[in-house]
Amino acid sequence: MDQEPIPSSLEDNPQFKEETSLQKFRRRFKEEPLIPLGCAATSYALYRAYRSMKAGDSVEMNKMFRARIYAQFFTLIAVVAGGMYFKTERQQRREFEKMVEQRKAQEKRDAWLRELEVRDKEDKDWRERHAAMEAAAKEAGKRKSVPEQDAARSAIEPADEKSIGVLAAVRELLARQN
């Protein structure tokens, strides 16, 4: 691969980004093309051995089984050599994936904390409104006095005064005396 220096911040390097499974397959295929080549050679040797067996050609079948063994050996060597060659890059990729997971977890935690703060603020606002309403109700209960009743009584029109009745008038007189 390229001999680029190790990036100081993996997020700034476009080489390290989140990828889909198809992108990952393509990238791995480009990084280590010998492994799929070895797998294809092994499959082809097995196919040819099968055809030779069906045809009854034991000499060709034995050659193809040997070719399969050589192809598998080639694939194994490609895997080991590729693993050694791309070791540092894989470590960087693992570190990057850990950082991405940590970033996602941190974003999720931050969103959760923001939601808790909003709920806490709403709760405090509700408690303040509730306390203010209770205080206003207590204040209104303390302020209820005779002048207020007289003010309410004066709002009644003179034509409606006659319909108050004797019982209400007696209660009003008793309330004024107390």
UniProtKB/Swiss-Prot annotation:
Associates with the respiratory chain complex III/complex IV supercomplex. The gene is rcf1. Cytochrome c oxidase subunit which plays a role in assembly of respiratory supercomplexes. Residues 136-151 have a biased composition (Basic and acidic residues). One of its GO terms (cellular component) is mitochondrial membrane. Disulfide bonds: none annotated. Residues 6-97 form the HIG1 domain. The keyword Membrane applies. Keywords: Membrane, Mitochondrion, Transmembrane, Transmembrane helix. InterPro entries: Hypoxia_induced_domain (IPR007667), RCF1 (IPR050355). The chain crosses the membrane at residues 33-49, 69-86. It is found in: Mitochondrion membrane. Belongs to the RCF1 family. The keyword NADP does not apply. Its main location: mitochondrion. Residues 136-157 are annotated as: Disordered. It is a multi-pass membrane protein. PANTHER family: HIG1 DOMAIN FAMILY MEMBER 1A, HYPOXIA-INDUCBILE GENE 1 HIG1 -RELATED. This is Respiratory supercomplex factor 1, mitochondrial. GO terms for biological process: mitochondrial respirasome assembly.
